[in-house]
UniProtKB/Swiss-Prot annotation:
It is found in: Cytoplasm. Binds 2 divalent ions per subunit. Homotetramer; dimer of dimers. Pathway: Amino-acid biosynthesis; S-adenosyl-L-methionine biosynthesis; S-adenosyl-L-methionine from L-methionine: step 1/1. Catalyzes the formation of S-adenosylmethionine (AdoMet) from methionine and ATP. The overall synthetic reaction is composed of two sequential steps, AdoMet formation and the subsequent tripolyphosphate hydrolysis which occurs prior to release of AdoMet from the enzyme. Its cofactor is Mg(2+); K(+). K(+) binds at residue 44. Its main location: cytoplasm. This is S-adenosylmethionine synthase. InterPro entries: ADOMET_SYNTHASE_CS (IPR022631), S-AdoMet_synt_C (IPR022630), S-AdoMet_synt_central (IPR022629), S-AdoMet_synt_N (IPR022628), S-AdoMet_synthetase (IPR002133), S-AdoMet_synthetase_sfam (IPR022636). GO terms for molecular function: ATP binding; magnesium ion binding; methionine adenosyltransferase activity. Its EC number is 2.5.1.6. ATP binds at residues 16, 165-167, 231-232, 240, 246-247, 267. The gene is metK.
Length: 382
């Protein structure tokens, strides 16, 4: 691709209402898996001023204190005062949790074949490219890093007037398919009422943005919109209702790749919405790292109760060194994409999910689906 273009992605902070919900959902999932790895969990959360509602379907032998887990997540994020409209000590925590439908369970846990079927029908996408060292699209990768830097500045006291809710949007200019310049940075952060707008703008630009983005990408043409409304005191659940699963593009590739529609947080790995999306990322990343293509998007689909994928699709956007059909043959040879195969390969029946609920599910080496363990075998095909 030789044309010049711009592309935009956004990220949100751990104090964003939707991300509060995601973190609570995954913290509850982790607590259950720590006691009962075979549990079936679909945990949904709603947060609003002074209230958290936890719902969903959970079938488990474990007992966890949902209220205590919820309060500790909110405390860790930093909502510790009723002046913010949300306080971990005084908020109400309501529960509306049921069990998994036996009709679903009989398809997932096939007692005759002992084969784990997919938890639902659905389609999942995985993506990787060479534009960053973590094989992620640059706009979403750097947007996440901006939000991480902001959280560190808030929690360390470096910028004591920061509050938990924030979001940023990053537009990068591309030439020949690679990022070369920052076109626009949009940055909105909740703050205490006693900080002057001009002081906030300077601090965010100098101490957050310029410390994260490559200096060679910034110039006098770069546009900055920092708290462009001028005031962001009311935020978090006081400002907006938050729900689990409403930041699926933030969680994945920032819009650079397609999305099957299913969210991740609060779901145990029998749900292919989550586990197969992780597997698809693993496949795509290894394909790119092995040199089979510079970009790779993979689609997998499943039928409920059926173990093998119903389809696999690959697009390398004209960058492939092999035919797409040949890459699909390699996928069938080197990757087990049944639900049980995915769970076993990535050791997914562990309490590892809360850390995924902020700053994206991809691009961090601590996640098992980010391993480059198939590169040697795949590269033999070249």
């Amino acid at each position: 691709m030789n044309e010049v273009y711009v592309f935009t992605s956004e990220s949100v902070s751990e104090g964003h209402p939707d991300k509060i919900a995601d973190q609570i959902s995954d913290a509850i999932l982790d607590a259950i898996l720590a006691q009962d790895p075979k549990a079936r969990v679909a945990c949904e959360v709603l947060v609003k001023t002074g209230m958290v509602l936890v719902g969903g379907e959970i079938t488990t032998k474990a007992w966890v204190d949902v209220e205590d887990i919820t309060r500790h997540v909110i405390k860790d994020i930093g909502y510790n005062s009723s002046q913010m409209g949300f306080d971990w000590e005084s908020c109400a925590v309501l529960s509306a949790i049921g069990k998994q439908s036996p009709d679903i369970a009989q398809g997932v846990d096939n007692q005759q074949t002992k084969i784990l079927g997919a938890g639902d029908q659905g389609l999942m996408f995985g993506y990787a490219s060479r534009e960053t060292d973590v094989f992620m699209p640059a706009p979403i990768a750097y947007a996440h890093r901006l939000m991480e830097k902001l959280a560190k500045a808030r929690k360390s006291g470096q910028l004591p007037w920061l509050r938990p809710d924030a979001k940023c949007q990053l537009t990068l200019k591309y030439e020949q398919g690679m990022p070369v310049e920052v076109d626009t940075v949009v940055f909105s952060t909740q703050h205490s009422p006693d900080i002057e707008h001009k002081d906030l703008v300077e601090a965010i630009r100098e101490e957050i943005i310029k410390s994260v983005l490559p200096a060679e990408w910034l110039n006098d043409k770069t546009r900055y919109f920092i708290n462009p409304t001028g005031r962001f005191v009311i935020g978090g659940p006081l400002g907006d209702c938050g729900l689990t699963g409403r930041k699926i593009i933030v969680d994945t590739y920032g819009g650079m790749a397609r999305h099957g529609g299913g969210c991740f947080s609060g779901k145990d790995p029998s749900k292919v919405d989550r586990s197969a999306a992780y597997a698809a990322r693993h496949v795509a990343k290894n394909i790119v790292a092995a040199g089979l293509a510079d970009k790779c998007e993979l689609q997998i689909s499943y039928a409920i109760g059926v173990a093998e994928p119903t389809s696999i699709f690959v697009d390398t956007f004209g960058t492939g060194r092999l035919k797409n059909s040949e890459i699909i043959d390699l996928i069938h040879t080197h990757f087990d994409l049944t639900p049980q195969g995915i769970i076993d390969q990535h050791d997914l029946l562990r309490p590892i999910y809360r850390q995924t609920a902020t700053y994206g599910h991809y691009g961090r080496e601590s996640f098992p689906w980010e391993r480059l363990d198939k590169v040697a075998e795949l590269s033999k095909a070249l």
